[in-house]
Amino acid sequence: MTSNRMQTGHPADGVYFGLMSGTSMDGVDGVAVRFEAGKPPAVLSEAFVGFADTLRDALFALQQPGGDEIEREALAANALAARYAVCCHELLRTAGLLPDDVRALGVHGQTVRHRPERGYTRQLNNAALLAELTRIDVIADFRSRDVAAGGQGAPLVPAFHATVFGSPDETRVVCNLGGISNITILPAGGGPQGEGHARNDTVRGHDCGPANALIDAWVERHLKQPFDDGGRFAARGKVDETLLAALLDEPYFRQNAPKSTGRDLFNADWLDAKLAGFQHLAPENVQATLTALTAATVADEIARHAGDCRAVYVCGGGARNPVLLDALATALAARGLDAAVATTAALGVPPQQVESLAFAWLAYRFNARAPGNVSTVTGAAGERVLGALYPR
């Protein structure tokens, strides 16, 4: 096979890979995509590579302080790079590409600590090893520059959302239901802008609270399953309003944006502390209540910041949970919002591709030396070029 790298209209144009392993820590999603100035992204292939239980356990253990962290982090980073490389080779195979055909690989890494209030965020990955294993330029560590500029370092996807999901006619909200929920508010008048931003001065967004991080943890504890398949465990239960009120009594939910969160706060220890006094509840009722918590916190933030919203488009793992989507629609209606709930597939982008596409796009922005953050979202001092390059 010979290289088919295109000569394109912008120096940064070409094929990029994007890899995303989220807070579920079950594996890595990857996409191969072609970016050309003024055109929508063209997905060439996608892949998913799972993580072994040993790696997943190691990553979960690194979420909290513990012994010998430097050694454990380094070994986990090497193991992650190996799995990321497998995903890249699968993308090369299915897209019929050679490494030289790929301009760069944008990789998020695995968040193990996110503490912007202390001036750091840690996405685990051995980017040098990944470049060695793939022979592709690797662009990594996207969040640190935003944090260095005084921002939250998250969410970073709103700039990409504005690029592909904006509308000239209606205010839209893009809601990512990953381990943590976050929203991007796209006021009417933006519209997709090809490779550029869609009116960054009006784009807003922030993390809302826990989503699959707690939902998955509870179902794994009681059913030994990695996630609530189709929301069926929650559907068997009934929301306990007293427990829901206790869960909602969390200072983060009252905090003003910009704000971001993660497993540093919303983890099994947080949940167990909240469940004190509720041991009598059936596990399925707790699951139903955790699902309602996610819906309520997202709906509260949309009602507070995007009352004119007419459409909510969901991506992330939660997009495959119809019980959660129904709960979100109900919660929005209860707050007086006439907003339809659908997945991003309705806008032409499968929900499982959105975040990996975003990090491919951030790599594209890096090569163009163009900013990748939205400072009104993260609170950074201004827009910045995000990422660090590890050449092939």
UniProtKB/Swiss-Prot annotation:
Coiled coil: none annotated. One of its GO terms (biological process) is 1,6-anhydro-N-acetyl-beta-muramic acid catabolic process. It holds the Pfam family AnmK. Its EC number is 2.7.1.170. The keyword Cell cycle does not apply. ATP binds at residues 22-29. Pathway: Amino-sugar metabolism; 1,6-anhydro-N-acetylmuramate degradation; Cell wall biogenesis; peptidoglycan recycling. InterPro entries: Anhydro_N_Ac-Mur_kinase, ATPase_NBD. Keywords: ATP-binding, Carbohydrate metabolism, Kinase, Nucleotide-binding, Transferase. It is an enzyme of class 2 (transferase). It catalyses: 1,6-anhydro-N-acetyl-beta-muramate + ATP + H2O = N-acetyl-D-muramate 6-phosphate + ADP + H(+). One of its GO terms (molecular function) is kinase activity. HAMAP family: AnhMurNAc_kinase. Catalyzes the specific phosphorylation of 1,6-anhydro-N-acetylmuramic acid (anhMurNAc) with the simultaneous cleavage of the 1,6-anhydro ring, generating MurNAc-6-P. Is required for the utilization of anhMurNAc either imported from the medium or derived from its own cell wall murein, and thus plays a role in cell wall recycling. PANTHER family: ANHYDRO-N-ACETYLMURAMIC ACID KINASE. Belongs to the anhydro-N-acetylmuramic acid kinase family. This is Anhydro-N-acetylmuramic acid kinase. It comes from Burkholderia mallei (strain NCTC 10229). The lineage of its organism: Bacteria, Pseudomonadati, Pseudomonadota, Betaproteobacteria, Burkholderiales.
